[in-house]
């Protein structure tokens, strides 16, 4: 069926236009928190992507094997994994592959029609850095969620503490 015929379908046409313009649907109910609430930003992020899941936002993405820690597992359960057996899944189970995650998201953004995101710990963003740099240069519409960003984070010690990362990423034009 060609696109002109599909665009005559009211729902398809609405979804098509929404995906081409990457706009937020009117029926989104944003999570609300009281000022001063002691809530981790990753939990707010999780609530936001769960609300956007299935709202016609065409949000696609996933985590580099850290779904419970960066609070993307709710989204994954709602939209299901993309796989050879489920091409309608919107969760991309990247595994321990930050660079491919970034490169894939860039490709999705360049193609258009979907709004990609990827999530990992901030300390692992260095593995994604070449893709992030290209994303910033091209001003691509992608979201990167970096959690556990404190230099005092975690029982894993210095290997999981992003001490120099924020300064390095601020130096990339258009990134932040």
Predicted regions, residues:
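Thiamine diphosphate
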Residues: 1-176
């Amino acid at each position: 069926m060609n696109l002109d015929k599909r665009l005559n379908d009211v729902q398809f046409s609405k979804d098509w236009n929404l995906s081409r313009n990457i706009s937020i649907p009117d029926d989104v109910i944003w999570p609300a928190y009281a000022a001063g609430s002691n809530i981790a930003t990753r939990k707010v992020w999780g609530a936001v992507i769960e609300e956007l899941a299935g709202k016609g936002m065409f949000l696609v993405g996933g985590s580099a094997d850290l779904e419970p820690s960066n609070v993307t597992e709710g989204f994954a359960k709602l939209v299901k994994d993309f796989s050879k057996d489920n091409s309608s899944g919107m969760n991309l189970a990247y595994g321990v592959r930050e660079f491919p995650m970034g490169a894939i998201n860039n490709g999705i953004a360049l193609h258009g029609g979907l709004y990609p995101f990827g999530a990992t710990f901030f300390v692992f963003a260095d593995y994604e850095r070449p893709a992030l740099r290209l994303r910033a240069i091209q001003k691509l519409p992608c979201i990167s969620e970096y959690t556990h960003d404190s230099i005092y984070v975690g029982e894993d010690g210095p290997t999981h503490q992003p001490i120099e990362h924020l300064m390095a990423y601020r130096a990339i034009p258009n990134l932040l």
